Amino acid sequence: MRRILIILLCAIFALSLAACQPDKTPAAQPTPIPSDPSIQPGNDEDAPLHTFYGLSVPGQVEYLYSDDGILLFEYAYQHIQMQIADQNVSDKITLDFLSRVDSTRANADSIAQQARESYDGSTTWSAYKYHIYYSPTRVDQGVISLFGTRTTYTGGTHPDQGALSVTYDAATGEYLTLGGILNHVDNKEDVCELVLDKLEDLDYQYSLFDGYENIVKDRFNADESTDEAFYFTNSGLCFYFAPYELAPFSTGIITVEIPYSDLPGILNDAYFPDEYQPATGKLIAQSADSADTNKFAQLMELVLQPEGEEVILYSDKSVRNIKITSGSWTPDGLYFLPDYVIFSATGVSNEKAIILRMSIPDIHPDLMVSYETVDGVQNYYFLKNNETGAIALLSVE
C-alpha cells in the first residue's frame, strides 16, 4: 500500500499553564505490553469503526535572541493535519485553521518588538512569550472541535491567559457558531439556563464574583456573538470563561460541560455523536518498519514530530477514541504532568491502522496514549528499547 506522508517543519513544545494546572497522574511501576506483529486482519464485527478520522496538531516554536545571546522572546503555535472522509473538507478546515494561526503573528511581532525595546542586559531578565496551543477535543463524522489556550508574558508576576476554540462541521468544513449548532436561536436561552445551573454547583469551589449570573446572561444574549465560547467533547458541549471573567485570576479558566443527555431538542441532531458498541480490544504499537502494512484495509498517516520515527498503531479487535497527550515529569520523577492533546482519532482495529511519525525515548516517556474499551479509558506511555528497537506501551496504573 502506497503511503503518503506530509512532513511539517515543526517541533512539539511543552507548555504548562500555572493558573490551569492539569491533573497529576501518579507514576506507576510500568507493565510492558509488547507489540504483537502476529495479529492477522479480519473483520471488526466486535465494534466496527464506521468512521476512521484522525487529527494532529504538531507545534512549532520561534525564538528571538539579543546580540549577546540572551533569549528575548518565544512564539509558539501549531499547524494542523488531518485525514477524514472528504479531502475537500479537510483542505477547507486546514486553510481556515492556519489562517487563524497566521492572524496571531501580528501580536507576536508586536510583543517581540516590546522585548527588544525592554531588554536592558539585566541578569534578572525573563523572556517574553506568546503561546497559542490547541487540543482536539472531538474528532468524528459530526464535528471537528478544538479547545486552546493563549498565554502572553511581557514581564510581571504572572502571564496573561485566555481561552479560544474552533469547531467545524465535519461534513461541510464550515466553521460553526453557537447559533449554527442549535435548533433555533431561542435555544440560546435554554443553554444559558443549563450553564447557570452548572455554575451554581461550582460557586463554592470557584468563589464566583457577585452578579456573575448577569455576565453569563449577557454572553448568551441572542444579539451578542458567542462564536468562540464553546467546543464539543465526546461527552458533551462545553462553555468556558476566561480568568477574571467570572472569578479571580487564580481560579483560571472555568469550563462547564453540558452532557448530551441534556441537549435533545436544543442541539441540532447532526452534532450529537453516534452511539456505538463498546470495543473490547487492546491497542498495539509497533515500529512501522517491521510491520506488514499491506494487511490493513485502511491506513492513516499523520505527523506528530517530524524528526521522529514511524510507529504503527492498531488493535487485535478494535479500540475507540484514541488521544495522545504530551507532558513532562516532576523533578522527583513521581508525577507525569500532561500538557495538551496533540493527536486524536476515532479508533483503530485489525483492519484500520494509524502510522504516526513521533519521537519515543528509551527513558522518561513524554507521550501518553489513552483509548476507550468496554472496561473504560486505558492509559499507557510510549517507550522504546534502543538496543532492539522494540516499542512497548507501559501501563499507567
Which ranges hold each PLM region?
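C-terminal motif of bacterial Sec signal peptides marking the signal peptidase cleavage site
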Residues: L15-A19
